[in-house]
Amino acid sequence: SVLEVNQLTKTYGPVKALTNVSFSVPEGAVFGILGPNGSGKTTLLSIIMDILKPDSGSYTLLGQPGNHMIRKKIGTLLETPNFYHYLSGEQNLKIAARIKECDERDIERVLKIAGIYNRKHSPLSSYSLGMKQRLAIASCLLGNPGVLVFDEPTNGLDPEGIADIRSLIIRLREEGKTIIMASHLLDEVEKVCTHVAILQKGNLLATGHVDEILTHDDIVEIHSTHSEFTVVAESMPDKTGLSRNGMYIQLMFPAGTANAEKVNRYFFEKGVVLSHIRITKKSLETKFFELTQKQ
């Protein structure tokens, strides 16, 4: 794996920013660190990039304990970069290349990847927020690192800028980059990431493949006036859960397994006639809420 995190803990006085957080990031993944503001996402990335020191725990990058030489192989965007607004995009990248000790001939390549090559001579003051963020990602790509670390890369952007950055991240993934990114946006993780770790108040709630952690459970919504309706619903096999929504009962099933005909037949065989049956999906927001409410 590209990154192994083992029992990281960090406190700020009485506040526990991270508590025994462990996970691994496989090569080629877009790994989302998902959580609301204050969940510990930025603290975690700052520890990984050696900006902060953990109270306890350890991590390895590219199979080695984090060190200066390893971090030179990683492109990082943890906050708004310090670009010079009176210089052009290309001139700003020349400064970044010198700091990173990268060949300036790489600038043309990263500008094209970021989609701002045609504005390379324009002063940064004329760039939109989305273009500035793409320039920041272009700076991360100097030297062609295999691993990229982004902290909320679409934060503060308009819908067009968000779409541009997400498309760029997907393109970088397709080119074989491993990307570790923090986000508080559930739909962003679903659309962009292959793997996810969910943080809440410094605790790791779940980690794994996005399709496994953020599954869209099937819901069969049913109703009957029969006196045994609830008893039969509770005995329904293969369901993963049951809840009430007003006059209806909602039966939860693993994604892709709900079968209205099978449910209807089961109730009929038990002597209960359903007056209403409908298959829906549990929203991703509901799933996320359930995970975070376990704390």
Q: What are the functions of these language-model segments?
A:
Residues 27, 118, 224-226, 255, ...:
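Non-catalytic surface loops within mature trypsin-like serine protease
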Residues 255-295:
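C-terminal coupling/interaction segments
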